[in-house]
Each structure stands twice: as structure tokens, then as C-alpha cells.
A protein has these predicted regions:
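Short hydrophobic "helix-edge" motifs at membrane interfaces and signal-peptide entry regions
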Residues: 15-16, 116-118, 206-207
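A glycine/threonine-rich phosphate-anchoring loop and its flanking beta-alpha core
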Residues: 1-68
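Active-site segments that bind and position negatively charged phosphate/pyrophosphate groups
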Residues: 61-174
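C-terminal charged capping/lid subdomain of soluble metabolic enzymes
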Residues: 161-238
Length: 238
């Protein structure tokens, strides 16, 4: 990912060939800040929701696309099953199966989604929301994966998949992933800033247009507001 001097995302660079060798030191990652692993989980979780909405809209699916779809589902399933165990390993500083599963999922399985799926297995709505948020200076302290995790929920609102949002909320709460602008300390963003974010998320080059339907700034703005209202009601209900 390339950013400008102000911290706004400019573009993704996709290389013609992949790494010849990748070495992973699980013990080194075990000793890293936990919030980085949580952000990595949020980013990898998007693999399923972005690949799924794109691949399901294809009239036919080649074998490599089917592999990408399978790997994307494995990302979601592994993250939902093993994240709690992995974070416990970091707290105790003791390797366990769940930690290794999460590391392999974030790096290896996640890489397979885009590796086999190419444009159909990389980004859709969630990453467009991330990209747009980077233009706001107030977001620059937030980790990439946290903004992407928020973007997943905005994408699901656009898809009108509130049932899936409800499924994810306990997981988000457990890991501390943001469920709203409020959770990211952005509740006071001005209306004109939200409008600018929505316009940026739907620029012609953005991957949100890989989703079926017409993706306009109004669609994104309304989804962000609906999500914010829903999460505010849940906070009041507590």
C-alpha cells in the first residue's frame, strides 16, 4: 500500500511474481504487541466478506476462483474459532495450537485468497471504506485492520445483511474491534467529512464497485449512518 505525505492511501501495488520463500517465526510474533495481531485478524476477516460478495456475483467460477472462495471461508471460520485461544497465548506468552492457526490463517490462507482469486479475491467494500477513512487526519492513529474491520460492517449494511452483523458483534466485542465510528473516537466527525469519505470510497477506481449494484456516495453515507444509529441503540440498551 502506498500513502501520500498526509497519510492518505494512494494505491495498492500488486507484484507480477510472489515471494520465493516465506519464513514465519511464531515465537517472535508471540512476543509482538497484541493489538497488531487483533488488527491482522480484522484485516483477514475481510477476505471472506469481500471475496464472497464478488465471487457470488460471477456467472461462472473457474477452479482457481473456487479455491480462492474456499480459502476465504477458511479464513473466516478459523478466525472465529481460534482467535480467543490465540490471544490467550499472547497473554500467557506460551505457544498453543490456536495461535499457530491464526498466524497461518492471516499469512498463508489469506494470501491464497488473492493469489488464486486475483481481483476477485482481494478487495471490495470494506477496503474502500478503509481507503476513504485514511483521508481523515483523525484516523491516522488507527491500525489498518481496525479500519477494515469497521468497513466490513459498513459493507454488510450495504448488502442488508444485518443478521451477519449480529453474528459478528460478539466476536468484535471480544477482540476489541471497532463496531462504529464512535468506537474509533470519530463520533464527532462533521457531516461534510462523512460526505467526503463517502465520495472518496466510491471514486471510479475503488474496489467497492466490484460489488453488485450501483455504489454511490449516498449508498455509503446512508450505510455508515445506519450502522452508527444501530450501534448507538445497542449502547443505550446496555
Amino acid at each position: 500500500m502506498m500513502y501520500d505525505e498526509e497519510g492518505a492511501m494512494i494505491r495498492y501495488d500488486v507484484f507480477a511474481s510472489s515471494n520465493a520463500l516465506l519464513l514465519i517465526d511464531s515465537e517472535m510474533i508471540l512476543d509482538s504487541p497484541k493489538e497488531l495481531l487483533v488488527a491482522g485478524i480484522g484485516d483477514t476477516l475481510a477476505k471472506w466478506y469481500e471475496a464472497d460478495v464478488i465471487i457470488n456475483s460471477l456467472p461462472t467460477k473457474s477452479v482457481e476462483i473456487e479455491i480462492a472462495h474456499f480459502a476465504a471461508k477458511m479464513c473466516r471460520d478459523n478466525l472465529l474459532q481460534y482467535s480467543e485461544e490465540a490471544l490467550a497465548a499472547m497473554d500467557k506468552q506460551v505457544l498453543n495450537e490456536g495461535f499457530v492457526k491464526i498466524i497461518e490463517t492471516n499469512i498463508l490462507v489469506g494470501g491464497m485468497v488473492g493469489g488464486f482469486g486475483d481481483d476477485y479475491g482481494r478487495c471490495a467494500g470494506a477496503h474502500s471504506i478503509h481507503d476513504a477513512l485514511t483521508m481523515v487526519p483523525e484516523t491516522h492513529h488507527l491500525l489498518h485492520g481496525n479500519k477494515v474491520a469497521y468497513g466490513i460492517l459498513v459493507q454488510l449494511v450495504i448488502e442488508n445483511r444485518w443478521d451477519e452483523i449480529e453474528r459478528l458483534l460478539p466476536f468484535y466485542s471480544e477482540l476489541g474491534l471497532p463496531m462504529s465510528l464512535y468506537d474509533m473516537g470519530l463520533a464527532t466527525l462533521a457531516e461534510e467529512t462523512l460526505v467526503a469519505v463517502s465520495k472518496r470510497a466510491t471514486e471510479p477506481h475503488e474496489t467497492i464497485h466490484m460489488m453488485p449494484g450501483e455504489m454511490t456516495a449516498d449508498v455509503v453515507l446512508n450505510a455508515m449512518k445506519q450502522l452508527e444509529d444501530s450501534m448507538a441503540m445497542k449502547r443505550v440498551a446496555k
